[in-house]
UniProtKB/Swiss-Prot annotation:
Catalytic activity from the UniProt record: an alkanesulfonate + FMNH2 + O2 = an aldehyde + FMN + sulfite + H2O + 2 H(+)
Gene from which this protein is expressed: ssuD
CDD domains tied to this protein: Alkanesulfonate_monoxygenase
Species the sequence originates in: Delftia acidovorans (strain DSM 14801 / SPH-1)
GO biological process: alkanesulfonate catabolic process
Pfam family, one: Bac_luciferase
HAMAP family cross-referenced by the UniProt entry: Alkanesulf_monooxygen (MF_01229)
Enzyme class, broadest EC rank: oxidoreductase
Function (record text): Catalyzes the desulfonation of aliphatic sulfonates.
Protein name: Alkanesulfonate monooxygenase
Source superkingdom: Bacteria
Transmembrane stretches, start-end: none
Length: 386
């Protein structure tokens, strides 16, 4: 099991949909979150993409020297990036980071944003372009280890004599992650990517997605890993966790929700449509209405695009829900919480000890200093002495 955290390059806050409790984004703050994730033992961090965010490649590059082992899940954008350039970017980053790059293939689902970026393709065409893009990208990087070149002619993208002089550290290329809920997305995932990501839907729906992608991949003689993107609200007691879930959306105004849902409705993303359906397009507001599956809460999606659900509960309950997803075949959990700095610590301290040993192994590199405040100037506390 791998647990990732999230770098909030679109801003951070204690409340959703309001400036109250907001935290200004700065490089110092981004570094704090990254250093915390690195030192706490998270496998890596997802760095978001889109016009609401700082550029993910610039941000990720700036975090290489302040982290030691943290991996960076960074987006490539067909239509915004050309595959040859994206291959050079990936190879350079991978070498300079010591092999810590992971690629997030993002097709995009907001037509207004895409058109602003110069991409005028419909849903089907975007997935065709993405399939061509990642095929070219993979081939260029794979051939770079032997000095090879690539000729490729597609419907949307073509290259002639494409060559990468300096290969990536990881062979054949940094692993490719990809998310999407449409049939076209599942086809692309099955044929070309290393790990398929889903947003946090109820376990039964996630199981259907996994089964579909797995079956499609088998037809190509491939296997695919699976990951899930979730928010987390974990506290020492169940009541505290649900109170903080309510508090997170307590400053939301009706007009803010209406405006956000109208924007989501204009998108042609199947994943976003499925997220919106979980809270009935913003009409559900109470805990009973927003708890769409045991301890799975859809309140975040009232105003946040993309991942809109959170696991809510005490540490043991949240760990149990994570294990339920793991039993379905999920091995990568990309998590976040508001505010991201404090919640990175809280989740690691409360939930990591309850997860498989492979997660805790990343914490074993301590320097032998105090673990907790020394008791009576005599000894450091241990779990057995609590």
């Amino acid at each position: 099991m791998q647990v990732f955290w999230f770098i909030p390059t679109h801003g951070d806050s204690r409340y959703l949909g309001t400036a109250e409790g907001a935290r200004p984004l700065s490089h110092d703050y981004v570094k704090q979150v990254a250093i915390a994730a690195d030192s706490l033992g998270y496998e890596g961090v997802l760095i978001p993409t889109g016009r609401s965010c700082e550029d993910p490649w610039v941000v990720a590059s700036s975090l290489i020297p302040v982290t030691r082992r943290l991996k960076f899940l960074v987006a490539v954008r067909p239509g915004l990036h050309q595959p040859s350039l994206a291959a050079r970017m990936a190879a350079s980053f991978d070498r300079l980071s010591g092999g810590r790059l992971l690629i997030n293939l993002v097709t995009g689902g907001d037509r207004a944003e895409l058109e602003g970026d110069g991409v005028f393709l419909d849903h089907a065409q975007r997935y065709e372009q993405s399939a061509e893009f990642i095929r070219i990208w993979r081939e260029i990087l794979e051939r770079s280890h032997e000095g090879g070149t690539l000729d490729y002619e597609g419907e949307h993208l073509s290259v002639k004599g494409a060559k990468l002089l300096f290969p990536p550290l990881q062979k054949p290329y940094p692993p490719v992650y990809f998310g999407g809920s449409s049939e076209a997305a599942h086809d692309l995932a099955a044929e070309q990517v290393d790990a398929y990501l889903t947003w946090g839907e109820p376990p039964a729906e996630v199981a259907k997605k996994i089964a579909d992608v797995r079956e499609k991949a088998a037809r190509h003689g491939r296997s695919v890993k699976f990951g899930i993107r979730l928010h987390v609200i974990v506290r020492e007691t169940e009541d505290e966790a649900w109170a903080d879930a309510d508090r997170l959306i307590s400053r939301l105004k009706d007009e803010t929700v209406v405006q956000a849902q109208a924007a989501f409705a204009r998108m042609d993303s199947e994943g976003q449509r499925r997220m919106a359906a979980l809270h009935a397009g913003g009409s559900r507001r109470t805990r009973a209405e927003l708890e769409i599956s045991p301890n799975l809460w859809a309140g975040v999606g009232l105003v946040r695009g993309g991942a809109g659900t959170a696991l809510v509960g005490d540490a043991q309950t949240v760990a149990d829900r994570i294990k339920e997803y793991a039993d379905l075949g999920i091995d990568t959990f990309v998590l976040s919480g508001y505010p991201h700095l404090e919640e990175a610590y809280r989740f690691a301290e409360l939930v990591f000890p309850l997860l498989p040993l492979s997660v805790r192994d990343r914490l074993a590199g301590g320097v032998g200093g105090p673990l907790g405040e020394t008791v009576a100037n005599l000894y450091s506390p241990r779990a057995s002495q609590s």
